[in-house]
Amino acid sequence: MKFTFKSSFTILLTIFSIFLVFLLNEEGEIPILFNLLTFAGIYGLAAIGLNVHFGLTGLLNFGHAAFMGLGAYVTVLLIPHAAGREGVVVTTGLPFFLALLIGIISAALFGLLLGLPAIRLRGDYLAIVTIAAAEIFRLLVRDLESVTGGVYGIINFSSSLQQYRLGFIDNFASSNDLNPSQIWVAFLSWTSIILVLLLLRRLTNSPWGRALRAVREDEDAVRALGKNAVWLKLQSFMLGAGIAGLSGVLLAFNYGTIQVSTFVPILTFYVWAIMILGGVGSLTGPIFGSIIFWVIISETTGIAQLIF
């Protein structure tokens, strides 16, 4: 990361934001801090995926919630769970990490399917298509109650992930009066961020990454050089969608339930706000942007009631 004035200011603002959490909460600082870090990790991961779309390639995606939701629903439906108004119990399923892999791939493939007809569109037209796709996804999930649980959602799936919880998580949680399930999700979220950033750093410094930035700056020039700009944008769309799918899974396991009301348009705009706060096009910017965003949310009581 190159430390310019902008990046240094963002880091200082992030540190100040965390300090503000302790300053404004006289009791229970540690639980509040870890609640903030959990949401910051999950949404930061989602913003990294969006940054691949817009910051790296210049694609206006306003349907990010659909990618998050698809990854979450596919993963949860493939493991033991209870769904719908009647609480229909499914006792068999795949191992969690295999289901997670399928969920991520499903989100990436949805990015491919959405991108095939839409990726040739530019600017506002692509934004409109992605918003429409996200709403179609949400309505389908709501209406397919026999599969997705509809408005009643899906519950009793958290044990598939929690059974892999590491011992030091329980020790740390018990010594600090924290929820071990949430600490485990927070640990996985920030571990995922590190792994994804390492992958993206390698990719963005490769010829492929430079080609994506060229598409963002001047797509016609890329075509003139003999590069397939459409295929490059599709690859970017798939990669960002897969990362979003992973963040959606973590969001579902943090709540312990998955409902259609979670993956609404406002979720996409939260992720956009985080990306912009951290700096569009910056690999690590979404992390700082997410922390700043969630400090603002947690310390603004009226808004926090809408989220928590």
Predicted feature residues:
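Membrane-water interface segments at transmembrane-helix boundaries in multipass membrane proteins
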Residues: 1-42, 74-105, 135-217, 223-280, ...
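Central hydrophobic cores of alpha-helical transmembrane segments in multi-pass inner-membrane proteins
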Residues: 40-51, 107-112
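Small-residue-mediated transmembrane helix hinge/kink sites in multi-pass secondary transporters
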Residues: 51, 76, 115-116
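Short hydrophobic faces within alpha-helices
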Residues: 61, 221-222
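An amphipathic alpha-helix/helix-turn recognition signal
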Residues: 66, 113, 216-217
